[in-house]
Regions:
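Compact, glycine-rich, soluble single-domain proteins
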Residues: 1-122
Length: 122
């Protein structure tokens, strides 16, 4: 069973981005991600977790992903360092700055988050 976490945008007042995001810290759960799924619900999300900040280890692919994804890179301090609307079947997306966490979810997330925002995982 994969653990879940609540993802909050720290603002005044705090905004919940995803009430239950899959916490993917094992190789197999990170590899699987949203591949081979045909649909993405608005409240679906996952967090790919690395051991430390980096650019290469937090790069993602969109092979066998059939829908657009909001991708939000967050560093170890909880700061959003990059965002992108990832398109199906693209080979690679990498953050502009080192990150430890990669949040993937419905494209609507991009309207709620910007670089420099603070994120908290509960």
């Amino acid at each position: 069973m994969t653990a879940t976490r609540k993802i909050n945008l720290i603002s005044d007042p705090a905004t919940t981005l995803l009430a239950q995001a899959r916490w993917c810290d094992a190789f197999t759960s990170k590899l699987r991600g949203f591949t081979f799924r045909r649909h993405l619900a608005e409240n679906d999300g996952l967090v790919l977790v690395e051991k430390e900040d980096g650019r290469i280890n937090t790069a993602i692919h969109m092979l066998f992903v059939f829908f657009d994804l909001a991708v939000i890179w967050v560093n170890d301090a909880g700061q959003v360092v990059d965002t992108v609307l990832a398109k199906p079947w693209r080979l690679s997306y990498a953050p502009q700055a080192p990150a430890r966490y990669v949040i993937e979810g419905h494209p609507r997330l991009l309207s709620q988050v910007k670089v420099g925002d603070q994120i908290r995982f509960e």
